[in-house]
């Protein structure tokens, strides 16, 4: 991988396969992701060449995963009521998401969501679904969450959205 294609977490060799999957998933969903008006979320995005736009999205997911699981694929958080589900893996997804977001088949018995490649594919699908629905990457206003902030609390105002945005922008040299 060239330095330009290297992602933040690629310093650990086992994550390079994660990066390939993430970049492939984003490239496949880019048309949907771009309907979330990433230019509004990160001014200058639209002026980036396509490979840097894909890298921007990858770094956004990597930053989300850092706050959600500290990049630990076997991380499980037991959500308190009323949710009462387990949030699993890099992006802290739940098995209950499968029918809601029309995800690939997930099998709790084989711990599908603890497989980083499955988790990343599903996370990109969830994000692309939400940004298409709301035409925004992430926003929070008076308790109303849109885009990725509907799903990931780290993308909500008062949480880590600014750190996540800044990490993704820095990775592609956006001011």
For the regions a protein language model found, what residue spans apply to each?
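Short, solvent-exposed loop/turn and secondary-structure capping segments
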Residues: 74-79
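Alpha-helical scaffolds flanking conserved acidic
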Residues: 54-62, 88, 141-151
